[in-house]
């Protein structure tokens, strides 16, 4: 059903190229396949159950245009959950900042004082593609490398709405939790 919906939404619009993989090989693998098709100056990822505010991309690009040394721009992050009582939203507890150098952004990302939802220059993704050593958690490594290699990291006012749900691979208890350790080990 999702494939059919995507085809109907993007039909006739040359800005979109749909890619369908034969099997699920994890988020990092899929994103690396998509990056090979990316032609723009900036890259952002949006997971299938998440959404962006109407102005999110425009807001991020305006920060890049105003600050030529900026290599990564963080969205405001709002987590949400659909409950029987309605939609519950909570802003991610991150201090807003004007600009950080890459090393400082990297340090703040280690304990997620800085979240990992951002737009980056395509050149960062080309230099540091997604670590596909694990099916989960390895995108954390890529985020940290992008921050570390950035001349400047800034925030924008665009909002990324992140769907929080207990059945998510990274939130439920399973042996997949050990992928976190494997992902950390691959950072060496």
Which sequence ranges carry the predicted segments?
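Nucleotide-sugar donor-binding/catalytic module of glycosyltransferases
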Residues: 1-185
């Amino acid at each position: 059903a999702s494939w059919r919906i995507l085809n109907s939404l993007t039909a006739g619009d040359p800005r979109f190229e749909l890619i369908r993989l034969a099997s699920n090989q994890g988020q990092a693998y899929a994103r690396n396949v998509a990056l090979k098709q990316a032609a723009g100056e900036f890259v952002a990822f949006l997971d299938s159950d998440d959404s962006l505010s109407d102005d999110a991309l425009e807001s991020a690009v305006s920060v890049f245009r105003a600050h030529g040394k900026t290599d990564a721009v963080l969205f405001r992050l709002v987590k949400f959950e659909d409950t029987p009582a309605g939609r519950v939203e909570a802003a991610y507890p991150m201090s807003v900042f004007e600009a950080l150098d890459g090393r400082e952004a990297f340090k703040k990302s280690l304990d997620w004082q800085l979240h990992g939802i951002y737009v980056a220059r395509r050149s960062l993704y080309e230099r540091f593609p997604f670590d596909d050593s694990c099916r989960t958690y390895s995108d954390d490594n890529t985020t940290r490398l992008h921050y570390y290699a950035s001349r400047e990291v800034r925030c924008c006012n665009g909002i990324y709405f992140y769907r929080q749900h207990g059945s998510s691979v990274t939130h439920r208890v399973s042996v997949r939790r050990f992928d976190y350790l494997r992902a950390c080990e691959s950072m060496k």
